[in-house]
Amino acid sequence: MQGAIARMCVLVAAAILNHPLLSPQENATLHDQDEELMARMREHEEMLEKEQAKLEKEFSQLTPEPENIGSEEEYSGYLWSSVVFLVFLVIEMFRMHGAHTEIAPFGDEDIYSEGGSLAPRLKALDKEVLNNFCDKCTYTSSNEIWRVREFVEGFADDLLESLRSVCDRDADMEVGDFVGIGSVFESWKVCKPLMCDLLVPFSPPDPFALQFHLWCSCSSNVPPNMQGCGKIKVSKSGGNEGCLCGSANMGEDMLCLLHNGNDVPSVERSPDDLLCTRNTSFLSKDQVMKWFQISVTKAWGRISHKYDFEVTFRNLDAAGALKVRFHSGKVVVLNMIPVVQLQDTDAYFVSHFPSGSESPPDPYWPLSFAVYERNLLKLISKRLPQNSCHLHCLQIVTFLHRKQASLTGRTALTNYHIKTVLLHLLLGKRASSWGTEHMESRLCDLLSFLHRSLQEKRLHHVMIGNSKVTELIQVPEIISRAEPVNLLRCLVLQAELHAQTLQHFNEMLKNAPALLQDYTPHWSNGLCLLGDGV
């Protein structure tokens, strides 16, 4: 009896595993596959009928035996039959899953779109409108950006030199030369007013030094929700820590046997004087921004008589957020951001983000790789075809994002996310695919990648833990070996924000044709008349 049941289980499992629908031929046509499937199904049907007749004959010949419920052999036989049958079923399920993956692979449109609706909306973007918009961007860039950069660099140099003269060289922070980052310095800025982001590095006076505690270091105690951040500890350096003349005012008639008369003893200051968080030795972003804002105000007061324009603070919560207004009405916006350089690298701990995104609480400082990103974009651009479309794609999407944000309000999506998507695409696609004739396809790729990232709530930082980047530029080893950081982690924790951001993106695509059409140049008597909206 047990043998017959086992044979029945094996027969059913074999029929499932060898079903013709589970083994399609990849290179066969649909007509050939249909005929072959029908033939195999008839063959299996005949085989099953023969086996069924054979099993019925065996069952009819069996003589009834007295039931022995306590028989250990009978239970063992049923158990083994069930185990064999379950094993075959598990194998069959895995084969069906693998067959489904091979038979019906998803295309890019299926992966990137929601219900297949993204691709048709992208096709609604007229090629002529895109080209006209890009011509306008090129015109604006070539005629304004370089003049604005030249002005900003000269003004920032003068302002920082005045700031150094205001500060006490023995007590205040030492300010270095600024570093230009962002869209203006990467030549893809499109919307007005033109905004220039400047990193202003500073360091503590002697004998103090900075120690860095990164989130990815082995001995780090940075919490998981502070990935991409670090703490900056202010410590005293040098060999004078055990000398009393450096920690107290001993009077002019006291002579230190460890130092000569030319050494000026310094009185130890409190953590607040060193811009640290209260009762700690870790540098405070709030204290730094307060110090920087006061210093910039004093510095501008010293040189304001030299200039024929007005300078005001745009945002009192963001130190160095300046607005320059000329008598003609033209406005130039500056973001002078106090930062701390990570040792001898091009990575900087920033006090705040110019985009206004939420900053982590003290004493955690977010780490910016904007200089590396600028260098990476510049290096990749040299390998692309002449008049490549990568910056035009970035300009189009950031323009649409800004215009949509003015209609529906701000969401979690920022221009930095869009630029990160572009860098991922530049690292993953051949250089020849970025020619100007491929602009529509690359624009579709960028929007599709961004849409998928928003749906999955996952967009990895392009510099952290990315082996493709280390092949092109020298990123600090501790950063290149770190685990990737998700830039959209906030969407995982906030369902309402995720829904708002997705709605913003869908509305942006819906309004894209109208927005681009409204802001394309109009030609009159051979002259390009540019609107004020860009």
UniProtKB/Swiss-Prot annotation:
Any single Pfam family the record assigns to this protein: Mab-21_C
Coiled-coil annotated residue ranges, if any: 25-63
Main location (coarse class): membrane
Residues that carry a glycan: 27
Keywords: Cell membrane, Coiled coil, Glycoprotein, Membrane, Nucleus, Signal, Transmembrane, Transmembrane helix
Bilayer topology term: Single-pass type I membrane protein
Localization in the cell: Cell membrane; Nucleus outer membrane
Residue ranges annotated as Cytoplasmic topological domain: 92-534
Family matches, as Gene3D superfamilies: 1.10.1410.40, 3.30.460.90
Segments in the Extracellular topological domain: 16-74
Cellular component terms per the entry's GO annotation: nuclear outer membrane; plasma membrane
Segments passing through the bilayer: 75-91
Signal sequence range: 1-15
Domain of life: Eukaryota
Function comment: Enhances Ca(2+)-mediated inhibition of inositol 1,4,5-triphosphate receptor (ITPR) Ca(2+) release.
Similarity field: Belongs to the ITPRIP family.
Official protein name in the record: Inositol 1,4,5-trisphosphate receptor-interacting protein
UniProt gene name: itprip
